[in-house]
């Protein structure tokens, strides 16, 4: 499906806005990498990478984490929930609960 990624990003944006999150995005200075959304939850600035499938490769999110060392990051996809070294993999169907889920670690 040609628009699967765009529709998935739109869904995530709507879920984030329901929670009153202010939404931004990030691009690298060379415009090679981009993170779909950046928001603040409590005292944390949270980069969010959206994947429409189970694909867990998020090179842009890896670049952001390398450059800025955020305590918490989110990748949302069709994969199962997992927390690994400050990286939260949140299934798409749970992204509306992100604000609660990032308090688990």
Predicted features and spans:
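A cross-kingdom feature that marks ATP-driven nucleic-acid transaction machinery
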Residues: 1-105
């Amino acid at each position: 499906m040609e628009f699967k990624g765009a529709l998935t990003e739109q869904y995530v944006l709507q879920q984030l806005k329901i929670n009153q999150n202010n939404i931004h995005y990030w691009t690298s200075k060379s415009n090679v990498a981009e993170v779909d959304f950046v928001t603040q939850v409590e005292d944390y600035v949270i980069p969010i990478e959206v994947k429409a499938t189970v694909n867990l490769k998020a090179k842009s999110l890896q670049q952001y984490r390398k450059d800025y060392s955020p305590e918490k990051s989110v990748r949302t996809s069709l994969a199962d929930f997992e927390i690994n070294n400050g990286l939260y993999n949140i299934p798409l169907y749970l992204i509306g609960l992100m604000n609660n889920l990032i308090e688990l670690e």
